[in-house]
Amino acid sequence: MSFYSNLPSAGQSSRGSSTSGRNGVGLEPLYPTIFEIMSSQEIDSLLPASIRYLLANHLVANFPNRYTLRLNKYFFEWFQAIKGFVEWYHLKTYNSTFIDRFYGLQLFSSRDRNLALTQCLNPKGQSEWPQGLQLNQQQKSVIFLEKIILPYITAKLDEILEKISMNNIFSSDETENKWPKRAFLRIYPFIKKLLALSNLLVKLLFLTKRTGSVSLLQYLFKIEYTTVRPLSSELSGLKETKGMDNRLRKTNISSIFALMQGQLSIIPRFLTFMGSQFFPTFIFVLRVYQWWTTQDMTTKLQKRVNDLDEDIPRPPFSSHSDKTEDKEGVSEACPVCEKTVQNPCVLETGYVACYPCAISYLVNNEGHCPVTNKKLLGCTYNKHTNKWEVVTGIRKLLI
């Protein structure tokens, strides 16, 4: 992941851009490469599909009950709820989303342009991120809306659009009370394409290093991308007094508790480090596992297709059919009248006979084939007329 962070920015050598400030230096050194952002967005979109794949193929398939089925049915709802808590924690703590943080990405507020330019010019700006460039509450809410709420609403609207489209295909009646559905079919795809085009234009501006935003909402609310930097605290004065008191402390319960708390504070940092190492590995293993299972399923399907292509054995024939097959010219003669077939039809057993002969024979012989003597499924007995009837036992041939 750190490979992309070490790539030189294409806009660092450009001068006189719209983001330029003092001495011709702009905000280009702050922006990451487009590869980092696209990789992060791709993983963010693949993560729910991968988790649902594991849930459906292992938990639901091995333990099918009403709880696991409901868990799979309402997957998008509870997954978005959990993701919302995780994303809000990371936005509040790190000014970054869960996936972006593992790619070394961070969001900052570009409303104070002079402070951002000072951060580029000041060599010490690489050490910590000032409070004025951190996201405010409104900008964090916008990112939460873009990452959590809007994808959920879009997914539900896509489902409604698909249902309405399918209903219009299979139902031809159009009444006046369906005008909201017709308006939705016209307006929603147009708005969706318009937003996609707007996001594409913002990405083109990002490629030209005119902005650090990659979406329309980020561009409107002055939210831009940068690489991860430590955030400065509002109470930075406490850092100067920390560690100055080297006097002996009293060994009472409070001091012992404070000492243990200080020693245990390393656990969250350790868990964060392990998570940063485990998450990329988990994503890689998950993709390999999906590829492996897909290849295995493809092999099984190909094997089944090959088994179907094998020669199908002929069905067993009765002694009467064997005698009939030995007769000369049986393939061109009707098995009932033993003459040349006129007005041909085919029976369920695959043999051809004259249509009048076949009807007469089947009715008088309780629906049995004249060649194999097998009962035809298309011949039924009518209890009202006390006669056998040919329903679907034969088919006319057009020659």
Curated annotation (Swiss-Prot):
Peroxisomal matrix topological intervals: 1-33, 93-136, 209-277
GO cellular component, one term: transmembrane transporter complex
Claim: Metal-binding is one of the keywords in the record: yes
Compartment(s) where it occurs, according to its Swiss-Prot or TrEMBL record: Peroxisome membrane
Comp. bias intervals (Low complexity): 9-24
UniProt keyword annotations, A-Z: Membrane, Metal-binding, Peroxisome, Protein transport, Transmembrane, Transmembrane helix, Transport, Ubl conjugation pathway, Zinc, Zinc-finger
TM ranges: 34-62, 68-92, 137-168, 172-208, 278-305
GO molecular function, a single term: protein transmembrane transporter activity
Stretch list, region Disordered: 1-24
Gene Ontology terms: biological process: proteasome-mediated ubiquitin-dependent protein catabolic process; protein import into peroxisome matrix; protein import into peroxisome matrix, receptor recycling; protein import into peroxisome matrix, substrate release; protein monoubiquitination; protein polyubiquitination; protein ubiquitination
Topology with respect to the bilayer: Multi-pass membrane protein
Matches recorded under Gene3D superfamilies: Zinc/RING finger domain, C3HC4 (zinc finger)
Pathway: Protein modification; protein ubiquitination
Its biological purpose: Component of a retrotranslocation channel required for peroxisome organization by mediating export of the PEX5 receptor from peroxisomes to the cytosol, thereby promoting PEX5 recycling. The retrotranslocation channel is composed of PEX2, PEX10 and PEX12; each subunit contributing transmembrane segments that coassemble into an open channel that specifically allows the passage of PEX5 through the peroxisomal membrane. PEX12 also regulates PEX5 recycling by activating the E3 ubiquitin-protein ligase activity of PEX10.
Name of the featured protein: Peroxisome assembly protein 12
Provenance organism: Saccharomyces cerevisiae (strain ATCC 204508 / S288c)
Gene giving rise to this polypeptide: PEX12
